[in-house]
Every structure is written in structure tokens, then in C-alpha cells.
Regions:
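Short, well-ordered coil/turn segments that N-cap beta-strands
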Residues: 20-23, 55-56, 92-101
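Active-site mouth loops of central-metabolism enzymes
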Residues: 30-41, 75-78
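Alpha-helix-loop-beta-strand connector modules within alpha/beta enzyme cores
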Residues: 76-99
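Catalytic domains of carbohydrate-active enzymes, especially glycoside hydrolases
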Residues: 45-65
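Amphipathic, non-transmembrane alpha-helical secondary structure
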Residues: 41-44, 48, 52, 85-88, ...
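Glycine-rich, proline-tolerant flexible connector loops at the mouths of alpha/beta enzymes
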Residues: 59-83
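N-terminal amphipathic alpha-helix/helix-capping segment at the start of soluble metabolic enzymes
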Residues: 2-24
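Conserved small/polar residues in nucleotide/adenosyl-binding loops
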Residues: 104-106
Length: 106
């Protein structure tokens, strides 16, 4: 009998973190962030639901790393320390469901 590799736990390479499965929420352009790039409560709850529903890795929407790199209204920003409280909150909520957060930037 073969192992169900998609639904079994596995060790994330290079870490001591065991993930519940290999399901990854791909980066989506959801345009839910505030004008300054900070996360909205709506966006945090939307991503948290994905972790609750079974994804082991939650990937954020594309994020800009410098103010001049913002490409559209509602884009997530990771360009300053002012963004950290929302990102830390999001990571904590994702982790509370046994998942991890992955940031993607453009």
C-alpha cells in the first residue's frame, strides 16, 4: 500500500517544523490591504480561514518591498516596520491552526 504523501505529515526541509500535509495556498492577488499596504482585518481573517480549513502553508498576496514598488491599490506592503504588527498578528493566527506563513514579494 502506498503512502498518501499529500495528506501525511512531513518535516519542512532545513527546519524542525512538521507540517500536517503538503497543501499550499498559492499567492493570489486579492487587493484587500489598506492604502498604506498594511493588512486589513478582512484579509487576515480570509487567510486564517484557509489555514483553519487545512492548508499547511499560506502564501500571502504579492507584496511590495519599497514604496515605489507598489503596483496596485490594495497591494500588501512589507516595506517598513509599520507593517510588522499586522504581519505578526497574521503569522500568529496562521500558526494557531498548525500552518505556516510564506511571504511573496514582487
Amino acid at each position: 500500500m502506498s503512502e498518501d504523501i499529500f495528506n501525511s505529515e512531513f518535516l519542512l526541509a532545513g527546519t524542525n517544523k512538521v507540517l500536517r500535509n503538503r497543501s499550499v495556498l498559492a499567492a493570489l492577488t486579492n487587493k484587500q490591504s489598506n492604502d498604506d499596504g498594511s493588512l486589513t482585518e478582512e484579509e487576515i481573517k480570509w487567510l486564517e480561514r484557509r489555514a483553519h480549513d487545512g492548508f499547511a502553508i499560506i502564501t500571502t498576496a504579492a507584496a511590495f518591498v519599497h514604496p515605489s514598488g507598489k503596483s496596485w491599490s490594495g497591494e500588501l506592503g512589507v516595506h517598513s516596520d509599520e507593517m510588522l504588527p499586522g504581519l505578526i498578528d497574521l503569522a500568529g493566527r496562521i500558526n494557531s491552526h498548525g500552518a505556516i506563513l510564506s511571504l511573496i514579494h514582487i
